[in-house]
Amino acid sequence: MAEDLEISKGSKEEQYENLLPQIEGLLTGENNQIANLANVTAALKEQFNFFWVGFYLVDTENELVLAPFQGPIACTRIRKGRGVCGTAWQQEKTLIVPDVEKFPGHIACSSLSKSEIVLPLYKQGNIIGVLDVDSDKLNSFDEIDEKYLTQILKLLDN
């Protein structure tokens, strides 16, 4: 079945408002986690043209492993507490980093990444990974991104 994404213009909030029901439609009736993660990353990349967007999933109690993503080649494994992703996982909270060069222990998978937001991904109350979104511009992410990306992640917790 072919799926078309309606790309919207307008403010960041308007774009998320338009995208949210489309992502919900993509996920409805599909139980395969990899397929759903892949469609979420593709939709976010298509709508916002983020430099990199993808998931890391818990592989062992101390390591995340790369999952579906859109963008340049990425780091394959990230230890708990390392970099933005590992820290967000360890702390189980969203991290917004306006300038990745100023984040202690930042893992530079790409020198072109300038700012980042990482959100925990939950399944039935347990953290199973993180959503990582990178921009090639400084200060790209804010509370609007956090609000809507959190809503998108809640759609995956079914």
Swiss-Prot record:
Q: Where is the GAF domain?
A: 32-158
**A GO CC term assigned to this protein in UniProt:** cytosol
Q: Name one GO molecular function term.
A: L-methionine-(R)-S-oxide reductase activity
Q: Which InterPro entries match?
A: GAF, GAF-like_dom_sf, Phosphatase_reg/MetRdx
Q: Please give the family membership noted in the entry.
A: Belongs to the free Met sulfoxide reductase family.
Q: What is this protein called?
A: GAF domain-containing protein A
- Organism name: Dictyostelium discoideum
Gene responsible for this protein: gafA
